[in-house]
């Protein structure tokens, strides 16, 4: 109990100025019309959006597109914060997506932070009051915690971090997007046959890594999966709020497209 109490009792370190809060949230388009319709317009400020899926499903690409589109809504004293824990950030890809836009200095508006430990990842969040970001991206949120912690301590440390993120999203009116991995979980099923009623078979189910802990502090959850790898067609499934709806889109050089090649 003492160990659990140590993880749960901590200061947020944020000073809140409620006078600066917006009357209405800002909705950041994703770059895909079908995905925007699924999300009710796009990614909203004041919410933590969890985007998870297998490797190559477009999680980082979606984050890059959000950075480009978010730049259109930035005020003079606002920025975009991109916290990279696995080395996925590609400035040349962000510039490629923004090439069609009149805003050619998109990279100047992105504060890039390469975190090599959970301490660095957590410290980056403390910079929110001075940076005043409109969008915060953490790609990926759970990776460093999986390396440094084990068992219950891993979940408690992650939930502590996510609680601060949720607190920041609500009180600083910023959109927070985190990405996450999936893992295969073995399922054991019992089959009843004429000769043996205890026959078991092993199968696997894909689940979000540390999904239970992440879900507690996520306001929206989006699962990405590959529909057609050759044509770069991705399916986005809205998992929370529970609608069980989906939208398909393609990854192209300028970002996303809703037109499919038959």
Segments from the language model and where they lie:
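Amphipathic alpha-helical transducer elements in NTP-driven molecular machines
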Residues: 28-32, 36, 45, 91, ...
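Catalytic-core regions built around general acid/base machinery
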Residues: 70-73, 160-171
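Conserved inter-motif catalytic segment of the P-loop NTP-binding fold
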Residues: 76-152
């Amino acid at each position: 109990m003492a160990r659990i109490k140590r993880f749960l009792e901590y200061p947020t370190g944020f000073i809140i100025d409620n006078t600066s809060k917006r009357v209405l949230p800002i909705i950041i388009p994703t770059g895909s019309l079908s995905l925007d319709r699924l999300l009710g317009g796009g990614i909203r400020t004041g919410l933590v959006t969890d985007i998870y899926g297998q490797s190559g499903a477009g999680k980082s690409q979606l984050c890059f597109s959000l950075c480009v589109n978010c730049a259109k809504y930035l005020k003079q004293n606002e920025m975009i914060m991109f916290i990279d824990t696995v080395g996925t950030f590609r400035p040349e890809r962000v510039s490629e997506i923004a090439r069609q836009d009149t805003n050619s200095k998109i990279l100047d508006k992105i504060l890039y932070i390469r975190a090599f430990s959970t301490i660095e990842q957590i410290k980056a969040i403390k910079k929110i009051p001075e940076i005043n970001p409109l969008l915060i991206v953490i790609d990926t949120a759970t990776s460093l915690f999986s390396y440094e912690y084990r068992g219950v301590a891993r979940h408690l440390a992650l939930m502590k971090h996510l609680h601060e993120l949720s607190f920041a999203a609500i009180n600083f009116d910023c959109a927070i997007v985190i990405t996450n991995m999936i893992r295969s979980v073995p399922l054991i099923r019992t089959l009843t046959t004429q000769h043996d009623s205890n026959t078991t078979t092993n199968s696997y189910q894909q689940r979000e890594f540390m999904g239970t802990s992440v879900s507690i502090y996520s306001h929206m959850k989006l699962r990405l999966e590959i529909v057609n790898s050759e044509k770069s067609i991705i399916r986005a499934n809205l998992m929370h709020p529970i609608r069980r709806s989906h939208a398909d889109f393609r990854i192209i050089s300028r970002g996303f497209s809703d037109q499919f090649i038959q």
